[in-house]
Design a protein with these regions (language model features):
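P-loop NTPase motor domains
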Residues: 1-195, 202, 260-267
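Conserved ATP-driven motor cores of ASCE-family P-loop NTPases powering translocation/secretion/packaging/pilus
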Residues: 194-273
């Protein structure tokens, strides 16, 4: 997809998500989407390890599809008891459902742009509104943010620039990416960002989650949020989820532009501004 870039004069740079990130940053869930059970996820992990062992760090998504089409491989893994044939087929269907154009596009890999993406005093924006499907948006947002979080929390980061630079990651429509769900993929994603919220302060990493549906953000992540800024919300469930005093909660649906409630339980009482 092409980003039009209208309405601003900021420098623009195209990038692609290299399939190798799945291996480099241990993110099998990036190609799994939703719906894999524990056995299928384990099967996917086995297949990815075998693929990158055979094809090297530069293995591509298209090569992985070709790799999965090998009936001899499927038979070998089934007979050895490592991946049941039905599990293999389920993984294959899920991997093939990844929208085209997400991986290995004709642009610079995002992993090679760490010094452009992260700059002391700089601001980088990753727009996704031009991407045609929610699955494409999900892959791009989670790939980039997980790369940043992974290097920040790692003792052996791939990028020293990311590791050493104080960083605030803002995620718009966060409920679309950090929702609680009973799938192994969702648990992996939520675990990553829960750890980021817990440990981020030590590594000079902050998470700034923006949402109209705070009640849909997974509890393990939401409970780690230290400061909440509440603007106008109309949904009763959303208002209840931000846990502010009743007197202030009653004002939230009627707040005008510029009005807000700021609540930082560790630092102060809720304040209306």
């Amino acid at each position: 997809a092409t980003y039009p870039g209208e309405g601003h004069r900021a420098e623009r740079m195209s990038f692609t998500i290299p399939f190798s990130m799945v291996d480099e940053y241990d993110m099998p869930w990036l190609v799994a989407g939703s719906g894999l059970n524990d056995n299928q996820y384990a099967g996917l992990s086995t297949l990815l390890r075998r693929f990158f062992r055979d094809y090297g760090d530069d293995g591509t998504y298209r090569e992985f599809l070709t790799f999965l089409d090998d009936p001899a491989l499927q038979e070998e893994l089934h007979e050895s008891g490592r991946v049941h044939e039905a599990t293999y087929d389920a993984v294959k269907r899920r991997v093939r459902a990844v929208p085209g154009g997400v991986f290995d596009g004709d642009a610079v890999p995002i992993t090679d742009l760490d010094h452009t993406l992260v700059r002391p005093g700089g601001l980088s924006v990753i727009p996704t509104y031009h991407l045609p499907t929610s699955r494409q948006k999900e892959i791009v947002v989670l790939a980039v943010s997980s790369m940043l979080v992974g290097d920040k929390l790692s003792n052996d980061p791939r990028s020293d620039r990311i590791k050493q630079t104080p960083l605030l990651i803002g995620m718009d429509e966060a409920h679309n990416f950090l929702a609680d769900a009973d799938t192994v993929q969702a648990r992996q994603v939520v675990s990553t960002f829960t750890e980021a919220a817990k440990q981020g302060r030590k590594e000079r990493l902050g998470l700034f989650l923006i949402t109209q549906d705070p009640q849909d953000i997974a509890d393990p992540v939401f409970k780690q949020v230290n400061t909440t800024v509440v603007l106008n919300l109309g949904d009763e469930e959303a208002i209840q989820s931000v846990n502010i005093p009743t007197a202030l909660a009653g004002k939230v649906p009627y707040m005008q532009k510029g009005q807000m409630v700021v609540y930082s339980p560790d630092n102060s009482e809720p304040v209306e501004l």
